[in-house]
Amino acid sequence: MAQNEGIPNGTLSAMVIDEDKCHADSTCSMICTQLNFCVTVFTSPIKALDFLQNQAEGVHLVLADVQMEEMNGFEFLKVARELHKSIQVIMMSTETTIYTMKRCVQLGAQILVKKPLDVVTIQNLWQHLDIKVLKMEKIKDMLQGVGDKSTCANEMNSFPENQKDGTKRKYYLMWTPHLQKKFLHALEILGEGQISLMIMDVDNIDRKQISTHLQKHRLQLKKKLSKASFTKGSNEDTSNPSAKNHLTCRTMTLQPHPYTNQPAETTMQIHSEDVEHDDVYDAMRRALQDGTAFDESKYSSDPFSNEDEDVVGDGYADKANAIDSSGDHYQVAVVLTTPHNVDYTQEIMNKVTTSDDVQVTRGGKATVSRLVDYSDSDSD
């Protein structure tokens, strides 16, 4: 049997579902007296579900028994929550075990209370209810009879759900990877000038948020480009062989020939970038053997003649600068420069002085010593 089936507008309503009619009636009277709720009592859970299916929006609180023969209380709770998701259900049971409490909470119940209910329990029921939902439901019921229904509905929908103390809460947009992918896709289609909301096809996003994110995107691109250019420049400096000028200096001391009467000591330093042609080798060898200067202008057709070549001295030493302490020895300086490889320079010098004794000191500079004698009368 159902009591007070007609729920009047403007009041909070409750339902009591219990197969024990005496307990259901006593609970109904205490709720009406203590909480001033309009209560509907059902002894059949099936009829209670039929009532909820037709008038689920008008019920704010449901008290249901767990141990019912016609339908288990857990099944009733599950179906009631499916019919009305915001409905608040309080379960009643003679056994308040941990399992029963956990099961009720998992299915969406507010709390499990022990039967039979007393006045103190009824008075404390409101502490377990969502008062905000109850107030909103009451306001909606009160506004149904005032003004146009469509106007009231629009005003209620415009109210923020999380409104507190009359201040509107500010929401922040989080750019998830999915939103970032849509943003980049729209950027490819339209470019950086404009991004259309229709292309992104995302709700709850405005142009201001898109423009702000576009500015951040441009700043990130600038940082990445500057970092990439700096890294590329540093790699080129370290990997470019021509970035550094490597100088290998060799000093050649020509020792006196054993068959000459008047020995003359000649020191030669050779500067050259890269010489590989056989004609150049032969000319250098002849110049060293004859004690004359090496003229590089005769070999301008050499493929490596574009490199800087510097010959110091003319084969006949200047007396103001080249005469040593003995007064009869001459010095001619020719410096040979090879990039990067000291061993390669050593190979060239070995080809030039194959028939003579060579003494080499390795390090930052290599020194080759050889003495050649020639008479002053031959040079005149």
Swiss-Prot record:
Signal peptide: none annotated. Two-component system major event consists of a His-to-Asp phosphorelay between a sensor histidine kinase (HK) and a response regulator (RR). In plants, the His-to-Asp phosphorelay involves an additional intermediate named Histidine-containing phosphotransfer protein (HPt). This multistep phosphorelay consists of a His-Asp-His-Asp sequential transfer of a phosphate group between first a His and an Asp of the HK protein, followed by the transfer to a conserved His of the HPt protein and finally the transfer to an Asp in the receiver domain of the RR protein. Residues 225-245 are annotated as: Disordered. Disruption phenotype: Dwarf, narrow leaf, low tillering and altered kernel color. GO terms for cellular component: nucleus. One of its GO terms (biological process) is cytokinin-activated signaling pathway. GO terms for molecular function: DNA binding. Residues 13-130 form the Response regulatory domain. Its main location: nucleus. The keyword Transcription applies. Keywords: Activator, Cytokinin signaling pathway, DNA-binding, Nucleus, Phosphoprotein, Transcription, Transcription regulation, Two-component regulatory system. It is found in: Nucleus. Residues 228-245 have a biased composition (Polar residues). It comes from the Eukaryota. Residues 169-223 bind DNA. The modification 4-aspartylphosphate is found at D65. Transcriptional activator that binds specific DNA sequence. Functions as a response regulator involved in His-to-Asp phosphorelay signal transduction system. Phosphorylation of the Asp residue in the receiver domain activates the ability of the protein to promote the transcription of target genes. May directly activate some type-A response regulators in response to cytokinins. Belongs to the ARR family. Type-B subfamily. This is Two-component response regulator ORR28. It comes from Oryza sativa subsp. japonica (Rice).
